[in-house]
Amino acid sequence: MEPPGPSTPTASAAARADHYTPGLRPLPKRRLLYSFALLLAVLQAVFVPVTANPAHNRPAGLQRPEESPSRGPCLAGQYLSEGNCKPCREGIDYTSHSNHSLDSCILCTVCKEDKVVETRCNITTNTVCRCKPGTFEDKDSPEICQSCSNCTDGEEELTSCTPRENRKCVSKTAWASWHKLGLWIGLLVPVVLLIGALLVWKTGAWRQWLLCIKRGCERDPESANSVHSSLLDRQTSSTTNDSNHNTEPGKTQKTGKKLLVPVNGNDSADDLKFIFEYCSDIVPFDSWNRLMRQLGLTDNQIQMVKAETLVTREALYQMLLKWRHQTGRSASINHLLDALEAVEERDAMEKIEDYAVKSGRFTYQNAAAQPETGPGGSQCV
């Protein structure tokens, strides 16, 4: 018996060879993981598209508008279908605002039996319903139309019943009182207006109002006459002074002020312009407007002169010229001095008065007959 060698199979090996069945080998672990990942990808591709857009299953009114990446929003009266905007059906459904992804329009409202159609539904507006005649819609319960109430025997109808408001009634006593009051007011108002018109006509105030409208009303109605009244008082005092020989010549009895007159006795237009040039250096800038209002110019005239004057320093001179042209020959240096005193610019008044006398163009009244020792009479320090 030969011993088994490397090339001679043993009996057990031969037996295993007889029972061996060819088939699949067991898969390695790595290939098993790859197969599992591929299976998950297939399942995701199958099920996710089915549930990705649940908005199509909701009613049109509850769908959220979603941005369409391919185009802008659909206009009112349209809805989005297959990427295109399509119109709603007239009288059936509508959309009142622009939308991005509504896949259907909103159905129009159908009016209930107790209401009638006020405005029919179109592609952009829903149906508007209102209550039938004899009924009204209460604000607290608008879904139901209620019957209009009737006024009792002791009441009068104040407002009639409308589809949106009930009838309002008021007692006959109160109604009679209001009716009488309305009649009295209707009678008295024309009478008062007529009496007022007659008073305005008889007093001549309408002429002043007409002049005020043409020239522009002043802020203070009394300021226009203040300078003239002051000058009239001074002239009256001067007349009394002439008849009183015991009073110092050239001074008034009441105030002690003196009137300035041109030396040559002629028209003082050039002399006034000479004084106007000096005023721009003496009168403070903040007092220019008040001074001109005191002299009688309106705010509109003041602003117009300022706008037309290029150099600020020339504005007062131009305003004084405007006043002189408007006043005419009655304008005098005494008006200017009175106005300066009225606006509390006494220092400027005294300097201008002293300058006018020293210039030789003006002198105090009656100074030629009885000259005073000092230059210009009395000078204030």
Curated annotation (Swiss-Prot):
One of its GO terms (cellular component) is membrane. Glycans are attached at residue 293. (Microbial infection) Glycosylated at Arg-293 by S.typhimurium protein Ssek3. It comes from the Eukaryota. TNFR-Cys repeats lie at residues 26-86, 87-129, 130-169. Residues 273-356 form the Death domain. PROSITE patterns: DEATH_DOMAIN (PS50017), TNFR_NGFR_1 (PS00652), TNFR_NGFR_2 (PS50050). Residues 236-247 have a biased composition (Low complexity). It is a single-pass type I membrane protein. One of its GO terms (biological process) is intrinsic apoptotic signaling pathway in response to endoplasmic reticulum stress. The chain crosses the membrane at residues 181-201. InterPro entries: DEATH-like_dom_sf, Death_dom, TNFR/NGFR_Cys_rich_reg, TNFR_10, TNFRSF10, TNFRSF10_N, TNFRSF10A/B_death. Residues 202-381 are cytoplasmic. Keywords: Apoptosis, Disulfide bond, Glycoprotein, Membrane, Receptor, Repeat, Signal, Transmembrane, Transmembrane helix. Disulfide bonds join 74-85, 88-105, 108-121, 111-129, 131-145, 148-161, 151-169. One of its GO terms (molecular function) is TRAIL binding. Induction: TNFRSF10B is regulated by the tumor suppressor p53. It is found in: Membrane. Residues 1-52 form the signal peptide. Receptor for the cytotoxic ligand TNFSF10/TRAIL. The adapter molecule FADD recruits caspase-8 to the activated receptor. The resulting death-inducing signaling complex (DISC) performs caspase-8 proteolytic activation which initiates the subsequent cascade of caspases (aspartate-specific cysteine proteases) mediating apoptosis. Promotes the activation of NF-kappa-B. Essential for ER stress-induced apoptosis. Monomer. Can interact with TRADD and RIPK1. Three TNFRSF10B molecules interact with the TNFSF10 homotrimer. In the absence of stimulation, interacts with BIRC2, DDX3X and GSK3B. The interaction with BIRC2 and DDX3X is further enhanced upon receptor stimulation and accompanied by DDX3X and BIRC2 cleavage. This is Tumor necrosis factor receptor superfamily member 10B. The gene is Tnfrsf10b.
